Design a protein with these regions (language model features):
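Boundary/entry segment of secreted carbohydrate-active catalytic domains
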Residues: 1-17, 25
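Carbohydrate-binding surfaces of carbohydrate-active enzymes
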Residues: 286-333
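Aromatic-lined substrate-binding rim segments of carbohydrate-active enzymes
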Residues: 18-102, 129-133, 224-238, 242
Length: 333
């Protein structure tokens, strides 16, 4: 069993602490460290990949007899992405280009960044995943990859996304495959659309329900496919190690909120079909998860995995905070 801690969201902790921290991690009974390898940090300058800090960390892990799980944080994109791939910004449900920004839990890089339906964005993201895989696939103490952290793609969008031309084109293509033709869609939906360009996603409930539910279904399938594509890139350069992904919670509990559509991060059952395993996060104190809720979460993920590897990818071990709010310590079981 991999029993470990997450460490290093670049550039913290400072390098002067790494040696003593890894020594304490091992002495505390852990056997694994999970490291975030962030695209925005590694390729801060276009076409120049810098892994010096991660090289040192995996070296220290080996020295202290710790396995490593490497998380490819491709969704935290480089600050230059909009400049080098013009016209790739996400568009929200108000028709506004989304202004990306740094995330509260990571020091450098932007989210949501550019839309992965833009082929130029996906090409660059895939190259980061491939380059990272080639660099570390040969590690003797590599325990596996977490190919997509919490299945996040729209953090900091501040509204519903994505309505950019590339996503709309992908949505209409998905509809055509689903219904066979525009006539087939009109028959199923009881509509009179004259051309595919007239078919728009629903934005909110009752605007209208049919178009809204269809777009939500598309976003779920889109996330599933994106995870499969990430997996394919990594598997091509690492045919040996476990490749998983995990959501912030099981997909069955992902009901959406004012800034996200329900299950827009993919369906765990379909995700597991193309991955080596599936996982989830759990923050018992932060989200008031009791023992029954915790057990339900694990059972949901195990059900989706259907015999594949199951990881509790993140588990709150201490206090948590959002802004200046503070929370109590995690209660013992």
């Amino acid at each position: 069993m991999n029993f470990g801690v997450q460490y290093y969201r670049a550039p913290f902790p400072d390098a002067k602490h790494w040696e003593s921290d890894f020594k304490k991690i091992r002495e505390s009974g852990f056997n694994t460290v999970q490291l975030w390898i962030s695209w925005g940090w590694v390729e801060a300058t276009p076409d120049r990949f810098v892994y010096d800090d991660y090289d040192r960390l995996v070296e220290l892990a080996a020295k202290h007899r710790l396995g490593v799980v490497l998380s490819t944080i491709a969704e935290i994109q480089p600050n230059w992405i909009h400049r080098l791939v013009p016209g790739s910004e996400m568009v929200d449900n108000f028709g506004h280009k989304v202004v990306s920004s740094a995330r509260g839990e990571h020091h450098f890089g932007i989210t949501p960044g550019s839309c992965t339906d833009h082929p130029g964005v996906w090409e660059r993201m895939a190259r980061f995943i491939e380059t990272t895989g080639r660099r570390y696939a040969g590690l003797d103490h590599l325990r596996g990859w977490d190919i997509w952290n919490e299945l996040r793609w729209n953090v900091n969008a501040d509204a519903l996304v994505c309505f950019c031309p590339h996503t709309l084109a992908a949505y209409r293509c998905w509809l055509e495959k689903r219904f066979g033709s525009l006539e087939g869609l009109n028959e199923a939906w009881k509509r009179r659309y004259a051309c595919w360009e007239d078919v728009m996603p629903g934005k909110l409930p009752d605007r209208p329900y049919t178009e809204l539910m269809s777009f939500q279904h598309f976003l779920t399938c889109r996330a599933d496919e994106h995870a499969h594509r990430r997996y394919g890139v990594m598997r091509a350069v690492d045919p040996v190690h476990l490749i998983t992904a995990h959501g912030a919670c099981p997909s069955a509990l992902y009901s959406g909120d004012p800034g996200t559509y329900p299950v827009d991060r993919g369906n765990d059952w379909f995700l597991a079909d193309a991955l080596d395993g599936i996982g989830c996060s759990s923050f018992p104190q932060w989200f008031d998860v009791d023992d029954a809720d915790f057990g339900l979460r694990i059972d949901m993920v195990k059900s989706a995995a259907r015999g594949r590897k199951v990881w509790l990818s993140e588990l709150q071990g201490g206090r948590a905070a959002v802004g200046f709010n503070t929370y109590g310590v995690v209660r013992a079981a």
